[in-house]
Amino acid sequence: LALAYAIAHPERVTGLVLRGIFLGTRPEVDWFLYDMGRFFPEAYKEFVEYLARDDREDILMSYHDKLTNDQTLVHQPAAERWASYETSCSTLRAGARRVTGRSALSMARLEAHYFANDCFMPPDHIISNIRVIRHLPAHIIQGRHDVICPPVTAHRLAEAWGRNATLRLVDDA
């Protein structure tokens, strides 16, 4: 969101410090929904097997439908599966971490809503418009082992930004 804001209002921004780079692209969303589980197969299995077999073809819309359902007995378990999957994949320590209650619901609904709406940006919006903020200093900090936001995205952003961007990869993160 910081990047989208800076591109929309460059006159209000003096620089950016960014971490865990996510550009809101369809490949990044697909990575989260379909490919990230290669590194966390147990968490992915729980995430996907919660859905009926027929609903697994379009994981995003299946979860989105459940998460936006008014009935707590429908949206809350879906939210907890979504949030637990994400938090399980966000650590170097193996093992599922349960996220429950309003925290799970807030995280899952917000992310699914953004993902279902292409993060409210045209394809590749950030990189295509980086010229608007290229003059600003940017410090990009990225975990080398970040599975949710892989370092390749931070590299792509730093290269597109040019000389005013510094990229620091943190080896143990």
Feature-to-residue mapping (PLM):
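Catalytic histidine neighborhood in serine/cysteine hydrolases
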Residues: 151-173
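Short helix immediately C-terminal to the catalytic nucleophile in hydrolase catalytic domains
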Residues: 2-6, 18
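Accessory cap/linker subdomain of secreted extracellular hydrolases
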Residues: 61, 65-97
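Active-site nucleophile elbow and catalytic-triad environment of alpha/beta-hydrolase enzymes
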Residues: 113-130
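Short beta-strand/loop motif that positions the catalytic acidic residue
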Residues: 133-134, 140-142, 146
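Conserved alpha/beta-hydrolase "acid-adjacent" motif
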Residues: 122, 147-153
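Small-residue-rich helix-loop
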Residues: 97-104
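A catalytic-pocket lid/entrance helix-loop region that shapes and gates access to the active site
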Residues: 11-63
